Amino acid sequence: MPSRCPGVAGPPALARTEGSEGSAGQSYHQNSKGTGEQHKAERIKEGHRMSSHTAKLQELWRTTQIQTIHIPKSMTDASFLKHPELTSGQKRYLCSIAKICNSSYLRTLMKRQYMHLFHHGLQKPGVLTHHRSHISSRYSQKQHSPCTTWRHHLEREDSLGIAAEAPEMIIHALWRPLRHKEGLKIGYASKTRCKSLKIFRRPGRLFLLPVSSKDYQPCMNDETKEEDLLNECMQSMSIQEQGSSHASLTVSCPTPSSAIP
């Protein structure tokens, strides 16, 4: 009798375990089915969104973009703009070429470039003047003259390094656009180029002397004369057509001897 009890009690326990496993499997199947349907719905929505986005892009691509092109009045009757197959970019390119070939625009560009170079040359930092004032302030208690200060300072034993660096500072401080045939030679500078110093170079020494206001007065006169000469050259510039395919630029400027006494 005791041996039959476990056998009788055994099948209901197995049935309960099988029932629990079946319910768990059914719930898992339902959950996986629900998540699969959600993913499918999300994919469908995203597909609709992408299709609508591509449709908008295609519509924008097909529609022509209207752009405003400003064409000068002197070029409206030009034959190269009346071609029916020209696009807006090609018309703009042709107008830019015609604008460059215009004499007034070319004159403006030349004057702007010249004035830019001229002002850039005047705004170069004066390294030598600053260096000189710094050294003279250090030795002002012993010597009163800046010239003697430079002489005594350069004649010292450690003057070789400063003498080697001085020509570079002179070039930076006195750099200007070339006006005439005279230029900065190695170790020398013309009187009209130097506003505040006279430079005398010897084989082993470098001397700097102050200059009066009369020496740099011709420099200002040269600047005004050059600007007047540039304006005369700009006014006499013209474009002459040679044939039907190309044009040449003719500039008639006065000689320097007649413009500058």
Swiss-Prot record:
Residues 23-35 have a biased composition (Polar residues). It comes from the Eukaryota. InterPro entries: FAM216 (IPR029373). Residues 36-49 have a biased composition (Basic and acidic residues). Residues 1-52 are annotated as: Disordered. Belongs to the FAM216 family. PANTHER family: FAMILY WITH SEQUENCE SIMILARITY 216 MEMBER A, PROTEIN FAM216A. This is Protein FAM216A. It comes from Rattus norvegicus.
